[in-house]
Structure formats: C-alpha cells, structure tokens
From Swiss-Prot:
Disulfide bonds: none annotated. Homodimer. 4-HPA 3-monooxygenase consists of a reductase component HpaC and an oxygenase component HpaB. This is 4-hydroxyphenylacetate 3-monooxygenase reductase component. Gene3D superfamilies: Electron Transport, Fmn-binding Protein, Chain A. Belongs to the non-flavoprotein flavin reductase family. HpaC subfamily. Pathway: Aromatic compound metabolism; 4-hydroxyphenylacetate degradation; pyruvate and succinate semialdehyde from 4-hydroxyphenylacetate: step 1/7. It catalyses: a reduced flavin + NAD(+) = an oxidized flavin + NADH + 2 H(+). Catalyzes the reduction of free flavins (FMN, FAD and riboflavin) by NADH. Subsequently, the reduced flavins diffuse to the large HpaB component or to other electron acceptors such as cytochrome c and Fe(3+) ion. It is an enzyme of class 1 (oxidoreductase). The keyword Zinc-finger does not apply. Keywords: Aromatic hydrocarbons catabolism, Flavoprotein, FMN, NAD, Oxidoreductase. It comes from Salmonella typhimurium (strain LT2 / SGSC1412 / ATCC 700720).
Length: 170
C-alpha cells in the first residue's frame, strides 16, 4: 500500500471515530485565538490533565505557546455554528468570532464560552511534535461545568447532536 493511500485510509477510519467537539481558546500577550478541535482527551484526574492535538501547520500554535495557557470549551448541541466559525468554515474573522456576546474571561484570563458543557482552563505543561501534529499536555487549573444541554460530536465528517434519553422507570 502506498503511503498516500494508507494516509487516506487512516483518515477515513478516523472519520468513524465519533469525537466530542471542542473550541480550544487562548488569550494573553501573544494574542487571542481559538480553533475547533476533536483530538482532545483526558490524561489523568490526579492532577487533572488533558491532551490537545493541533496540526503543526496551524497559525494558532505560536499564539498558544506564547500565552502558555488555554481553555478547552466542550460544546453543547446548540453550538454547532460556533464550531463552524472556529473551524474556519464560515469565513468569519478571528476577532469577530470573539465579539459574539457569548464569551467571558475565566479566572486564568482565558476565553470561556457561555453555555458550553464544560470549560477547562489550564496551563500548557508540555508540547511534543508527533508526525504532522503538536500534542499539548495541559494541566487543568479551573473547571466550569454546565448542567444544561446535550453533547455535540463530529462523526463521518459531520456534526451530530448527542441527546440524553429519559430513563424508563423500572
């Protein structure tokens, strides 16, 4: 199998891996930016740590690294349009994305999306290059939780809501 063919088959296989949709944001002396990401994973709860993978060619990387802090905003099912904005699918400029009334600064000064299922503010403790991506290890320092809303996942190259069904009485 050729390398390009294997790469495409791998990408097709990963499209079958349903993943939560997040907007990873940062603000500080290096600037403010954000990106939609599905390659986000918990690492450990002691101490709370998360892994975020971003394409090494992304113009956001110097901003994330320069600020040294970020927020992982776990989107709810009604925030698909915001996910599209931060994925660059709508053509909205970066600063305009943050001028929406749904943003506030968290205790670490990071952009936190109101209504997100969770906002995890943290400090970047390590960055490694693996193939085409940078892997950020983030030590979580502040957690904001919402009890409202359902999940939003990306599956087969499309966004899908994930709704909790009512449990039937036993």
């Amino acid at each position: 199998m050729q390398v390009d063919e294997q790469r495409l088959r791998f990408r097709d296989a990963m499209a079958s891996l349903a993943a939560a949709v997040n907007i990873v944001t940062t603000a500080g002396h290096a600037g403010r930016c954000g990106i939609t990401a599905t390659a986000v994973c918990s690492v450990t709860d002691t101490p709370p740590s998360v892994m975020v993978c971003i394409n090494a060619n992304s113009a956001m990387n110097p901003v994330f690294q320069g600020n040294g802090r970020l927020c992982i905003n776990v989107l709810n099912h009604e925030q698909e349009l915001m996910a599209r904005h931060f994925a660059g699918m709508t053509g909205m400029a970066m600063e305009e994305r943050f001028h929406q009334p749904c943003w506030q600064n968290g205790p670490l000064g990071q952009p936190v999306l109101n209504g997100a299922l969770a906002g995890l503010e943290g400090e970047i403790s390590e960055v490694q290059t693996i193939g085409t991506h940078l892997v950020y290890l983030v030590a979580i320092k502040n957690i904001i939780l919402s009890q409202d809303g359902h999940g939003l996942i990306y599956f087969k190259r499309r966004f899908h809501p994930v709704r909790l069904e009512m449990e039937a009485p036993v």
